A protein has these predicted regions:
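Short amphipathic alpha helix immediately N-terminal
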Residues: 20-32
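Helix-turn-helix/homeodomain-like alpha-helical modules used for DNA recognition
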Residues: 80-101
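Short, Lys/Arg-enriched N-terminal segment that forms or immediately precedes the first helix
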Residues: 2-15
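Residues within the DNA-recognition helix of helix-turn-helix
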Residues: 53-56
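Hydrophobic positions on the alpha-helical face of helix-turn-helix-like DNA-binding modules
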Residues: 39-40, 50
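C-terminal flanking helix
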Residues: 58-65
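Helix-turn-helix DNA-binding elements, focusing on the entry/boundary residues of the two helices
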Residues: 35-37, 43
Length: 101
């Protein structure tokens, strides 16, 4: 599975909606960069089981974004902040601070 590192932003936004196990799997694979085998072996699972579980978490994050659109809204606010940075730097900086960028 090719790693889509943009998922880490979705994880930052929606990780609290995942179960502990889902967060652990996501972190192991995407943040700590462990292979499917490295995750599977200590747990006595197959690579395929771990692949399916990681894919499920990935799909869940995309589902949350499709419904809640927090990343989309953050991206729009960031673009707005960038566009007004020349006119009103204080407001631009405040928007960036609010969205955490």
């Amino acid at each position: 599975m090719e790693k889509d590192l943009s998922l880490t932003e979705l994880f930052d936004l929606y990780g609290g909606l995942l179960t502990d196990r889902q967060r652990e799997l996501f972190s192991s694979y995407y943040i700590y960069d462990l292979s499917l085998s490295e995750i599977a072996e200590p747990e006595g699972k197959t690579r395929q089981n771990v692949y399916a579980a990681v894919k499920s978490v990935k799909d869940k994050l995309h589902e949350y974004e499709k419904i809640l659109k927090l990343k989309e809204k953050n991206d729009q606010l960031f673009a707005l902040a960038e566009s007004i940075s020349g006119e009103n730097k204080d407001l631009s900086d405040k928007i960036k601070e609010i969205i955490g960028r």
